Amino acid sequence: MKNFILLAVSSILLVDLFPTHCGHNVDLSKAINLNGVNFNNVDASSLGAAHVGQSASRGRGLGENPDDEEGDAKKKKDGKKAEPKNPRENKLKQPGDRADGQPAGDRADGQPAGDRADGQPAGDRADGQPAGDRADGQPAGDRAAGQPAGDRADGQPAGDRADGQPAGDRAAGQPAGDRAAGQPAGDRADGQPAGDRADGQPAGDRADGQPAGDRAAGQPAGDRAAGQPAGDRAAGQPAGDRAAGQPAGDRAAGQPAGDRAAGQPAGDRAAGQPAGNGAGGQAAGGNAGGQGQNNEGANAPNEKSVKEYLDKVRATVGTEWTPCSVTCGVGVRVRRRVNAANKKPEDLTLNDLETDVCTMDKCAGIFNVVSNSLGLVILLVLALFN
């Protein structure tokens, strides 16, 4: 095995010391110089004597004359500077393949640029046009006669417009935009100053007499029904997507805010609820009507459980809340009413007491008991056997 390892290492060293002239290792700089001389039309005098000698030794350059090379060698021996030979090339064409005597572009006779008719300096134009595809006497753009710019009708200064339009695709007498007659801006009907509107509209896509937005008649803003100041609303709504008479939010009729039923001021509530997810007639926090704090919503104490608890604490119950009837989970607590403060304990009834539902910490389930017991057993086993 040792002999094999020594043999492998020795072989690697021998290959590394192998001569470089056996064709395996190539001088890249020489190859680059060879390619540059052989495959480019290069002036031999500009390369220097070394490159010329290399070209003579490695092969003839493309497009070179052997007689010229011999002449160059004789001239160099005589100490004279060789003159560069012109490469053999096809007849050079002028910029832009054109008709008779044209310097650039596909044009007709006497055209300096572009596909134009006679006497055109630039662009595809008719006679006497300086630029663009225009009719007679047009300075720029695809226009009708006498147009300075743009695709316009006669006498238009800019844009695709009808007669007498200064800018935009408009009808006669329109200063800007795609509008009807007499419109200053936008795609509008007659007499509209801005936007796509009906007659007499100052802005937006609106019906007659609307100042802004996509609205019905008499709407100041937004996509609304008649007489709505803002938002997508029904008639008489000031804001939001609401039913009639709603000030804000997605609500039913007469709702001021939020997704609510009729008469709800806020939140997702039933009818007549001011806040929270309470039932009907609940003011806040989901409390049942007339119940004190911590009553778990509208859940009333069970009468049977209250009676059983009263029997246990009858002797000690007073005007203060008793402890909760349970140590975990949901229980009940009681206290005397003010008018029953002086009653004897044995005379107390449920009508003499105030009751409340109390919630203690959640009771541990059977899974928790088993897991805790199992954990304790494992700890004891580890302690005993270690």
Curated annotation (Swiss-Prot):
**Occurrences of domain TSP type-1 (ranges):** 312-364
Region annotation Region I: where it falls in the sequence: 91-95
Keywords annotated in UniProt: Cell membrane, Cytoplasm, Disulfide bond, Glycoprotein, GPI-anchor, Lipoprotein, Malaria, Membrane, Repeat, Signal, Sporozoite
What protein name applies here?
Circumsporozoite protein
Show the disulfide pairing.
Answer: C324-C358, C328-C363
Q: Which residues are glycosylated?
A: T327
- Main localisation, per the record? membrane
The region called 20 X 9 AA tandem repeats of G-D-R-A-[AD]-G-Q-P-A is annotated at 96-275
Record's function text? Essential sporozoite protein. In the mosquito vector, required for sporozoite development in the oocyst, migration through the vector hemolymph and entry into the vector salivary glands. In the vertebrate host, required for sporozoite migration through the host dermis and infection of host hepatocytes. Binds to highly sulfated heparan sulfate proteoglycans (HSPGs) on the surface of host hepatocytes.
Q: Name one GO cellular component term.
A: plasma membrane
Family assignment from sequence similarity: Belongs to the plasmodium circumsporozoite protein family.
Q: Which residues lie in Low complexity bias regions?
A: 293-303
The propeptide sits at 364-386
SMART domains linked: TSP1
**Which range is the signal sequence, renumbered to this chain?**
1-22
**Disordered: annotated span:** 51-304
- Stretches of Gly residues bias are at 275-292
**Pfam families referenced in this protein's UniProt entry, alphabetically:** TSP_1 (PF00090)
sequence repeats mapped onto the chain: 96-104, 105-113, 114-122, 123-131, 132-140, 141-149, 150-158, 159-167, 168-176, 177-185, 186-194, 195-203, 204-212, 213-221, 222-230, 231-239, 240-248, 249-257, 258-266, 267-275
- Sequence ranges of Basic and acidic residues compositional bias: 72-100
Q: How does it sit in the membrane?
A: Lipid-anchor; GPI-anchor
Question: Where are the annotated segments for Required for the binding to heparan sulfate proteoglycans (HSPGs) on the surface of host hepatocytes?
Answer: 80-88
The protein's superkingdom reads: Eukaryota
Give a short account of its post-translational modification: During host cell invasion, proteolytically cleaved at the cell membrane in the region I by a papain-like cysteine protease of parasite origin. Cleavage is triggered by the sporozoite contact with highly sulfated heparan sulfate proteoglycans (HSPGs) present on the host hepatocyte cell surface. Cleavage exposes the TSP type-1 (TSR) domain and is required for productive invasion of host hepatocytes but not for adhesion to the host cell membrane. Cleavage is dispensable for sporozoite development in the oocyst, motility and for traversal of host and vector cells. O-glycosylated; maybe by POFUT2.
